[in-house]
Amino acid sequence: MQIAVYKPKHKVRIVTAAALFDGHDASINIMRRIIQSTGVEVIHLGHDRSVEEVVNTAIQEDVNAICLTSYQGGHNEYFKYMYDLLKERGASHIKIFGGGGGVILPSEIKELMDYGIARIYSPDDGRELGLQGMINDLVKQSDFAIGDTLNGEVKTLQNKNAKDIARVISSAENFPEVAKEALEIIHKKNKNSKTPVLGITGTGGAGKSSLVDELVRRFLTDFPKKTIGIISVDPSKRKTGGALLGDRIRMNAINNSRVYMRSLATRQSNLALSKYVHEAIQVLKAAQYDLIILETSGIGQSDTEIIEHSDVSLYVMTPEFGAATQLEKIDMLDFADLVAINKFDKRGSLDALRDVKKQYMRNNNLWDIHQDDLPVYGTIASQFNDPGMNTLYKAVMDKLVEKASADLKSTFTISNEMSEKIFVIPPSRTRYLSEISENNRAYDKSANLQVEVAQKLYGIYKTIESVLNVTASELKQSFLDTYGLNSDEILKHVQDDNKNFIKLLIAEFDRVKLNLDPYNWEVITNWGETVNKYKNPIYSFKVRDQEIKIETHSESLSHLQIPKVALPKYQAWGDILKWCLQENVPGEFPFTSGLYPFKRTGEDPARMFAGEGGPERTNRRFHYVSAGLPAKRLSTAFDSVTLYGNDPDLRPDIYGKIGNAGVSICCLDDAKKLYSGFNLADVMTSVSLTINGPAPMLLGFFMNAAIDQQCEIYIKENGLEKEVEAKMAKIFKDQERPKYNGGLPQGNNGLGLMLLGVTGDQVLPVDVYLDIKTKTIAQVRGTVQADILKEDQAQNTCIFSTEFALRLMGDVQEYFINNNVRNFYSVSISGYHI
């Protein structure tokens, strides 16, 4: 049965987000879509949002409710802290809703709702109510008036109290009659206001929000004491009345006490601005912000509404506007003070820049101005410190001073560089993966053709065998030893009436064999030798100039000899060649079964997985799970605080997640404690680091922990303990010395704990330390996950831009190559997360 959609009686606004250090955004994305379709204006923040950021947003946006998902633990502290912070800031009317699947226990749900959380939805609620039913309940509880009364907020606007500013805007938007008197007072106050308004408009998807964020970041740096207000407008849905106010998800610089942002829905069709924009601007002027930015929703070619509300207007577009004649239809090119061609990394950007400049020149009759001096700029807002954005920012500030007499004289320094995408993968190599797949398909096609040739040769061979008076082994020897057919030798065994026939077959064999690659003929001729290698009791091969001998068979409980590598019993050359070209034995091309002929013996592939609490607790767990086993295969899970590259803290929304579902590691000493008692340079020890975003940093901790372990061994072997202790006592003269908390677990000999708080280069001669370092990093075994593409697509712990993160991956691998790090892998592809 279809559940009826609840229709709210008031204009309901809700903030949606996923909790701090939580990348599970699939659920909240589904929920906010249903909330929006229920007629609600949704301010969506995305994933990994702190309590302070959510609360600041809720107050600035004057919302009815906050809706959160939390799947990463720490929910008790997170929700309670949010409730307390809202209460502390006088916003306890904002209701809090949450969910986390089975992560939040029924007892915890009761505890949180008793504390004051409006509702935590459980899987049982989902089964009972359905998705729409849950959203109906949420919206119904949030359906109350905002701004129906004012209590003197207008008198304190100049204090820039976000709650007061937001309430006056809400009153003007929701109850114009209630706000009428307050707005009259504001208009009188603003008669002499010199606060400039920068209007930013453009087509949908042009990157306006990212561009605004970059302008704000530069403004805050350029003017350390000035403030900025932002009004961002998004369209309302005509069908439902709901709206997605999603500009904040692109804003990284606005969580600052000097920035106020308010998102507005148009609440009308076919217009890019809300009819209450003027009132919102007046409120921000009364609050005495130094600059106001007004960003519209996406506009069409004929929309110029922005110029009525702004002192300076900026039109944002992309290079993909179609034919140059389309520019003649864009009204904003007649009125805009500045034009930004964003996403300037797109193909054809330079041509677009030229065409837009020409059109701008024609529209404004600027025939005497050189094209380079026209206010048209190429920008890449998504790229950090983009030169085009720097130039645009300076031009905007200069225009505000010129047109609005604003006290915003910029000291921002710019270069004459043009925006140019800094590519991790050069454009000429963007088809790299396609080329690999094309090459693989071409290889498969070639292999199949070669298989057909080999099979035809085998058919000719069997035909000759059937008419000769020789055994198959004699004929085969004749074929293979002579690398072809020895006609004279074979014809000795042929009756006179068959000689011409055999000559024809031999000639055909030689002709067909011309189409067979010599390498493939060698594969066929060596097949018998390959089979014998795996029949012999011992298989010998070399790895890095070291000869390794492996038993080819293992003995079963029934005392049967079971081959470790079983070869197919093919006879036909086509079958043999196809198997060798597409599968083959381990250690041979195409390496489908690994790089080496056999796996290392004496090291069972047991995964000793651990990660909980602090480093000492997980260290004890590692020693417990590896006790009595010759090989130590330590696999490390990190908590969400570490996964997002943050330090642990007493702040409740962080504190609740420390050591939850993984170990908390934030410094080198933590890594030393975590792996203490395990010789990380031992050939029987390997470590897996399940970390991605901050992988290079955690890898650095691990490598330095391993190096300092070997420094400790060197110190003890050379009797340098007293000398080193004296140096460390001097270093820690006026501070507490770090230590391993609690007693050492069984099996932990304390290796790695001597140099807590220092590194080997502080207590050993430089040449000794560098020698130990070089040897250690070449010996350590293991892997770090560092699969950034998977994070970008699924897990959401890519804490840097994807391009920068990929560059880091490349830099790490380059270091490994240059320093002979061959036993530790710099990346482990784990696409199963996707």
Model-derived regions: residue spans:
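Cofactor-cradling patches in redox/metallo enzymes
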Residues: 21, 28-133
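Conserved Switch II/interswitch segment of TRAFAC-class P-loop GTPases
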Residues: 70-75, 296-300, 309-326, 336-337, ...
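Catalytic alpha/beta active-site cores
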Residues: 72-74, 102, 528, 532-834
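Canonical P-loop GTPase G-domain recognition
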Residues: 111-139, 334-407
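Extreme N-terminal, non-catalytic leader segments
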Residues: 131-196
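C-terminal end of P-loop GTPase domains and the immediately downstream helical coupling element
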Residues: 148-152, 363-471, 476, 488
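Nucleotide-state-sensitive switch-loop elements of NTP-binding domains
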Residues: 172-195, 206, 211, 215-302, ...
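Intrinsic disorder/low-complexity segments
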Residues: 469-500
